[in-house]
Structures are given as structure tokens and as C-alpha cells.
């Protein structure tokens, strides 16, 4: 069955440019037809219980028009409606039928939002198939985009207030001789409400006849209940706020409860303000200049977004990336272990990459199978943790290095220590993490690693440049995590379709990647210079 086809002829003044653009649109419609996205739309169409009444718009052409507008224009709903009236290319796609903005909004909510990942990946797979793209090298990066929320209507997670209120409630229960009704854990509003009800029943307190205002004398039991009820109202409020925030964030906004308070990059780099704004953390996975996967997160950093992004990629492409290169924001032990477990070749920079590359913070310790060695070729002695050297990491091991007084590298090794004159130093390391960092270091410094690092800057940063600058997308228009995710999907799909349309003439996907010269040698970090101590 042909889903995406122009069936209704419309009168358009012919011109050479129109013919070229219409040919591109026909190829774009063929791409959608071959991708299988029509089956998804058909499934939604015939399972929609609200499709009563007169016949609606052609959903396939409506979908094609929305995707085309996101690729070519600043695609707000009213802008798409405007293009359906005045732009010949969009008018050609919708066959002269002009939907209004509410129809477009309902279509996005009913057809695209529930099946956004399926729609996104099936179109991408068809582009990869047509141009025979190599997607073995993948790059992940993120950016923060401002949410559509009132920046003054923010709420902080009331953790401290909740703890203080819990102490007050327990003190009140002690006054009421109910100390056996609670444990050391935080009292829930449900249990506290039951305690108050039982207290009223045992003391014959009529809740409706407790007088308010000055000059009204109350019994001790009535005073206790009145104060306890005030605490109950506050407790319910705090629990509701903590439930909205969840475990992984400390704030939300009243006008968009899924948005989180963040410092945006514009504020950070301009140095004009460090005020918090409502925002979302947008992550994309790019390969061969094609956005293969996207994700919308509430995390303020990129540390914990790496694994969910790769899991999404595996879920919809049935494989993990062969090689992956990311910046130092993703370089932690948990992510390195994940890459080893799933056979992903590690080109992810670690936290001290820039320090080692510049020579300001060089590598001071080297790990081998039997232990750790320092720059002065002293082997570290594994010692137990004590009162002065507390364990900071679950897998950490404490090492002691002796012979520091005659070491010519101590000016670097002890630069950040208070006691620089001692003949020893302690360091806590994770041996397995150090081995994984060494593997990443060797991969990144190899000729293949140099090529991947340069292409990471070209592809991933160029993608964000397309979205933010060329497509003028710097603020999210929808509210709620699911709808925001669908909007980001449409923007990412718009970037891919834009590149697809520009590559149709050449029959080759435009690729600005940098290739390694044949005589390129391995990069070497600067060595640490020895500095003799003054006698």
C-alpha cells in the first residue's frame, strides 16, 4: 500500500526552481514510504477511539508536511500553518488541504508523541541504507536548552525542612505520650494522620468544635492536636514536593514540573549572570553527520546520561556502537566499565585529559598488573585505610610511596599537598579504573584516536550549531518530559532530513569528516621535567 503519494493534482505556476524542488519532495516522500513509518501512522489511525465525525486530513501527508517544515523552517505550529497556505512546496505536500494549528498540535500529540523513537529510527535506518553510511564511529554530547517555564516560579526540594519538621513532630508525639508510635525513620503523612486520628478518638476531641482566635482557651489535648494538624499540612506539602522532584534532582518549576533549575551555557560563557533557568539536558548520538539517537534528561551534568543513551541506541538498532568518542564529561569509572562489558572501543576522554595534554597536571602514577609505580620508579605499598586516610571510593585502594625527599618530581607530585617536606605520600587509586584510563589514553593518542577526536568536534559540535544557530532553536516550546522529547525528536529528524535533501543531487551523503594522513604518527604527551632541589 502506498501511504506517501501525491494523488490530488493542484494548479501551481510552473517554473524551473519549482520543478527541482518538487522532484526533491517526491524523493523525500519515497524515503518516507520505504522507511515503513506509514505502518506506524496507519496503526495509530485505526486504533484511535476519538476519530469519529467527518473525514479528517490525510495523516500521511500531514506527517510529511510537519517533518519538512521542521527541516526547512522555524517550525512553530502557527508557522507550519502559515507555510501550508503560502509556501508552494508545503502546499504541494498537503495537496492544497490547509490544516490549522490546533489540527497540527493534535496530530503531533496523538500520532508522534507515543511512537517518537520508532518513527525516528525507522527513517534513520532508511537513510543509512540508501547512502550506505558507516556508523561504526559514534559521538555523544549534550547541551542545555531553556524550557518553556516561568523562571521565577521555581521550587527547591525541601529536604532540610522535612528533616526539621520530622524532629518537631517527634517532640510533639513525646509530649502526647505517643513515643512508641514511631521509629527512627522519617514519619510518613499517612502514618502520622492515623496517629492523630487515634489520639482524637482516645481523648474525645471533637475536631469541628475546636475554637480559633484570641481569647479562646483550649485544653492541652486540643492544643496538641491543633499543632499536630498544622504539622500534618506541612508534611503533606513537603512529601508532594519531594515526590515531584524525585531522587535525582533538587528543584522543579510550577509551570513545567519536569523542568529543572540549571545554569545555561549562554550565562556561563558570557559571564554576565549565573542565575538559574528552567532547562532540559538534551543528549544526541551522532555518526556520519546523522543524528542516530537523542535523549531528554533532567541531569545537570553528563555523567549519568552516557549509559541511558547507549541503552536507547541498542534498543532501537539492536547493536552497540563499535567505537565511541566523547568529551571528558563522560569519562568516569562507571561508564568505562560499561564500555568494556559491551565491547565498545573506548575513545572517551578522562577527567584529567586537558591537564595531561598541556603538561600542567601530568600523569603521576602508572598502574601495572602487580601494583602502582610513581614517576621516580618507586613501587607503591598497599596499606590499610586509617583515621587520617578515609576511604572515598568503594573500590579504592590506599598506596604509600616512600623516598620523596630526594625525588626530582616532588615539585609536581606534592604541589597540592600541605606537608611537602615529608619523605612519603599517600594516594588512593582504583587500580581497575587506572587500567581503563590507560587503555583510553592509548586509544586517543593513536592515529585512529586523533582522527576520531577531530571528527567528534566537527560532527557533534556542528550538529548543535545547526540546531541552535542555523535553525534558530534556542528555547523549547512544549511542556512535560514526553512532549519535550517529541519536540527534540522532530528537531533532530529535521536536521537529518535537511542533510538528506541537500545530498539528493549528488547521490552521496555530504560528509565533512577528516581523514587521517598515511604518515601520521602517534601523539605523545609532554614529559615531566625533573627539578633538582636546592641544597
Kindly give the residue locations of the regions a language model identified.
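Hydrophobic alpha-helical membrane-insertion signals
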Residues: 1-26
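Helical catalytic core of nucleic-acid polymerases
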Residues: 36-40, 51, 87-94, 102-103
Amino acid at each position: 500500500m502506498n501511504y506517501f503519494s501525491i494523488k490530488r493534482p493542484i494548479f501551481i505556476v510552473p517554473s524551473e526552481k519549482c520543478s527541482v524542488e518538487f522532484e526533491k519532495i517526491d524523493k523525500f516522500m519515497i524515503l518516507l514510504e520505504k522507511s515503513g513509518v506509514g505502518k506506524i501512522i496507519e496503526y495509530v489511525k485505526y486504533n484511535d477511539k476519538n476519530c469519529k465525525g467527518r473525514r479528517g486530513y490525510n495523516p500521511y501527508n500531514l506527517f510529511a508536511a510537519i517533518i519538512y517544515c521542521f527541516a526547512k523552517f522555524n517550525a512553530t505550529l502557527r508557522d507550519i500553518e502559515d507555510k501550508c497556505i503560502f509556501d508552494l512546496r508545503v502546499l504541494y505536500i498537503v495537496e492544497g488541504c490547509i490544516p490549522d494549528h490546533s489540527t497540527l498540535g493534535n496530530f503531533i500529540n496523538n500520532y508522534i508523541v507515543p511512537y517518537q523513537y520508532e518513527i525516528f529510527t525507522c527513517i534513520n535506518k532508511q537513510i543509512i541504507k540508501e547512502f550506505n553510511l558507516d556508523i561504526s564511529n559514534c559521538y555523544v554530547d549534550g547541551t542545555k536548552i531553556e524550557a518553556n517555564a516561568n523562571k521565577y516560579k521555581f521550587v527547591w526540594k525541601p529536604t532540610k525542612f522535612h528533616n526539621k519538621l520530622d524532629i518537631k513532630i517527634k517532640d510533639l508525639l513525646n509530649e502526647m505520650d505517643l513515643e512508641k508510635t514511631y521509629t527512627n525513620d522519617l514519619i510518613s503523612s499517612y502514618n502520622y494522620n492515623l496517629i492523630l486520628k487515634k489520639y482524637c478518638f482516645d481523648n474525645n476531641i471533637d475536631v469541628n468544635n475546636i475554637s480559633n482566635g484570641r481569647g479562646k482557651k483550649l485544653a492541652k489535648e486540643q492544643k496538641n492536636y491543633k499543632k499536630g494538624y498544622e504539622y500534618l499540612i506541612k508534611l503533606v506539602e513537603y512529601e508532594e514536593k519531594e515526590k515531584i522532584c524525585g531522587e535525582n534532582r533538587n528543584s522543579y518549576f510550577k509551570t513545567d514540573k519536569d523542568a529543572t533549575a540549571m545554569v545555561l551555557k549562554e550565562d556561563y560563557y558570557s559571564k554576565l549572570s549565573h542565575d538559574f533557568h528552567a532547562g532540559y539536558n538534551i543528549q544526541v548520538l551522532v555518526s556520519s553527520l546523522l543524528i542516530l539517537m537523542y535523549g531528554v534528561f533532567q541531569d545537570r551534568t553528563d555523567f549519568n546520561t552516557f549509559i541511558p543513551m547507549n541503552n536507547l541506541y541498542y534498543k532501537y538498532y539492536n547493536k552497540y556502537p563499535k567505537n565511541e568518542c566523547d568529551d571528558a564529561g563522560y569519562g568516569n569509572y562507571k561508564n568505562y566499565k560499561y564500555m568494556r562489558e559491551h565491547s565498545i572501543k573506548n575513545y572517551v576522554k578522562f577527567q584529567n585529559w586537558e591537564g595531561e595534554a598541556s603538561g600542567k597536571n601530568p600523569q603521576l602514577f602508572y598502574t601495572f598488573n602487580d601494583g602502582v609505580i610513581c614517576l621516580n620508579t618507586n613501587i607503591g605499598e598497599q596499606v590499610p585505610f586509617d583515621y587520617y586516610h578515609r576511604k572515598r571510593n568503594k573500590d579504592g585502594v590506599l598506596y604509600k610511596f616512600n623516598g620523596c625527599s630526594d625525588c626530582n618530581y616532588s615539585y609536581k607530585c606534592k604541589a597540592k599537598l600541605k606537608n611537602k617536606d615529608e619523605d612519603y605520600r599517600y594516594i588512593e587509586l582504583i587500580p581497575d579504573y587506572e587500567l581503563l584510563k590507560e587503555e583510553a589514553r592509548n586509544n586517543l593518542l593513536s592515529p585512529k584516536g586523533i582522527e576520531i577526536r577531530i571528527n567528534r568536534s566537527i560532527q557533534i559540535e556542528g550538529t548543535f550549531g545547526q540546531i541552535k544557530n542555523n535553525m534558530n532553536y534556542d528555547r523549547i516550546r512544549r511542556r512535560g518530559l514526553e512532549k519535550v522529547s517529541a519536540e527534540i525528536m522532530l528537531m533532530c529528524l529535521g536536521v537529518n532530513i535537511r542533510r538528506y535533501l541537500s545530498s539528493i543531487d549528488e547521490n552521496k551523503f555530504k560528509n565533512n569528516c577528516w581523514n587521517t594522513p598515511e604518515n601520521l604518527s602517534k601523539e605523545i604527551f609532554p614529559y615531566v621535567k625533573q627539578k633538582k632541589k636546592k641544597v
